[in-house]
Regions:
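Active-site anion-handling motifs in enzyme catalytic cores
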Residues: 1-363
Length: 363
C-alpha cells in the first residue's frame, strides 16, 4: 500500500484548522497509509487526529521515534527515501509566503530546498486546500514563484486565488476547502426549520460599523421572535464576543459561554442561519444545514470568505460590513427553504469534486 508522510503542523487553538486537517487525513487514508507527524501541536489536537476507526492513520513519531523538526529533518527524509513513502504532504490553510526578516527568509528557503534536493524524485510533494498570497512584482515575486514551484501540486481553495496565480505557477489547481468533507453530512438537515440564528465574530477594526449593522439585523429577528445566539469556535474570539454581548445586550441576544469544540460541531444543525466572519464557522454551519452568511471586512483573513463563497455558492452569501443590508439577510431568511435547498446542491458538488480529485491524485 502507498505511504504518505503528513506534517500536521498548523495554527494552534483554531478548531477550523484542526477540522480541515482531520478531514483531509481521513480522506487520504482511503487510498494510502498516512503517517502523521503532530509534533509541536497541543495534546487535544493529536487526540482528535488519532481518534479514528481507520487503521491507515498512523502516528509517525510513535512508530519511527522522529519528528520533522530541526536536526531530525535529514533523519526523517532518509526514512522517507528508504521506507517506501510516495508522498510528502502538509496541513491545509494559508501558505505563508517568503518575506523578511532575513533569518526567517533563509530558514524557509532551506526548509523548502532540503526536501526537494534530498527526497527521491518519485516522492511527490502535495499541498492541498490552501491559499496563496504573495507580491506580483519585485524580488519577492521571483523568490516566491521559485519557492511554491518546488511542490508537485498546490490545490487552491478558491477559483479567485487560482485565477490570480494561474499565469505565475504551473503546478496549481482548484480543490474545495476540506470542510466540505465533514463526515456527518445529511440531506435531512437542510429540511428542518428551527427559528434560531447564530452570530460568531473574530475581532474587527470597524467595530462601530459592525455594531450598527448587527443592531439592525437583531431588530429584524426580534420582530420575528427568532432566537439569536452569540457563539464562538476559537478561544481568542471569546473576549471580542463578550464585548459584542455588552453592546448588544438589549437586543435579546444569548451568549454561549462554552466554546464550540471539535466534538460539538453538530450544534450548528440547530440554526437556520449562521452569520460570521470566520470561514469555518460558516462552512461547518453550511454542512449542518444552516444558511452561512459572511459579514466581512477587507482584511485578507476575511477576504478569503468572499473568494471561497464566490467559488462555491450559486447565490451571494456574503457582504462587506459597510455595504451590508439587513434587508438582504431578511430575504434569505424568508426564503430559507429554497435557499437551503440550493446550498445543499452546491455543497454536494464541492464535496464530490474534492473526493474525486483526491482519489485521482493518490491512485
Amino acid at each position: 500500500m502507498m505511504k504518505i508522510f503528513y506534517s500536521a503542523y498548523t495554527c494552534q487553538g483554531n478548531i477550523g484548522d484542526l477540522l480541515i486537517t482531520k478531514y483531509q487525513i481521513e480522506e487520504y487514508a482511503k487510498y494510502a497509509e498516512v503517517f502523521v507527524d503532530c509534533h509541536g501541536m497541543p495534546q487535544y489536537f493529536s487526540k482528535v487526529i488519532f481518534d479514528t476507526n481507520n487503521p491507515n492513520v498512523k502516528d509517525f513519531e510513535k512508530i519511527y521515534g522522529l519528528y520533522y523538526r530541526g536536526k531530525n529533518i535529514f533523519k526523517v527524509l532518509r526514512v522517507l527515501n528508504n521506507g517506501g513513502f510516495g508522498f510528502f504532504c502538509s496541513s491545509p490553510g494559508p501558505r505563508v509566503p517568503l518575506n523578511l526578516p532575513v533569518r526567517s527568509l533563509v530558514l524557509k528557503m532551506l526548509g523548502a530546498l532540503i526536501p526537494y534536493v534530498v527526497l527521491n524524485k518519485r516522492i511527490k510533494r502535495y499541498s492541498l486546500g490552501v491559499d496563496l498570497q504573495f507580491e506580483r512584482t519585485g524580488f519577492f515575486y521571483w523568490i516566491n514563484r521559485w519557492y511554491f514551484g518546488l511542490f508537485d501540486i498546490i490545490g487552491l481553495r478558491s477559483k479567485e486565488n487560482l485565477s490570480t496565480y494561474r499565469g505565475v505557477l504551473n503546478n496549481i489547481c482548484y480543490i474545495p476547502d476540506m470542510a466540505f468533507l465533514f463526515p456527518y453530512f445529511d440531506e435531512k438537515k437542510y429540511r428542518c426549520n428551527h427559528d434560531k440564528i447564530a452570530l460568531s465574530f473574530r475581532n474587527v477594526t470597524e467595530y462601530n460599523v459592525l455594531i450598527d449593522k448587527l443592531k439592525n439585523i437583531l431588530r429584524y429577528f426580534n420582530d420575528k421572535e427568532i432566537h439569536v445566539d452569540l457563539i464562538y469556535q476559537v478561544e481568542e474570539d471569546k473576549s471580542f464576543c463578550e464585548r459584542l454581548m455588552c453592546d448588544l445586550a438589549e437586543n435579546n441576544l444569548s451568549f454561549k459561554e462554552k466554546m464550540v469544540a471539535y466534538s460539538d460541531l453538530e450544534v450548528y444543525e440547530n440554526y437556520d442561519m449562521v452569520i460570521s466572519n470566520r470561514l469555518h464557522v460558516l462552512l461547518i454551519g453550511a454542512m449542518n444545514g444552516a444558511i452561512p452568511y459572511g459579514l466581512i471586512s477587507h482584511d485578507k483573513k476575511e477576504k478569503k470568505i468572499a473568494d471561497v463563497f464566490s467559488s462555491v455558492f450559486s447565490c451571494k452569501l456574503f457582504s462587506y460590513v459597510e455595504n451590508s443590508s439587513s434587508a438582504v439577510i431578511a430575504t434569505l431568511f424568508c426564503e430559507r427553504d429554497s435557499v437551503r435547498s440550493q446550498i445543499y446542491k452546491n455543497v454536494c458538488v464541492q464535496r464530490n469534486y474534492c473526493e474525486r480529485l483526491i482519489e485521482r491524485l493518490f491512485n
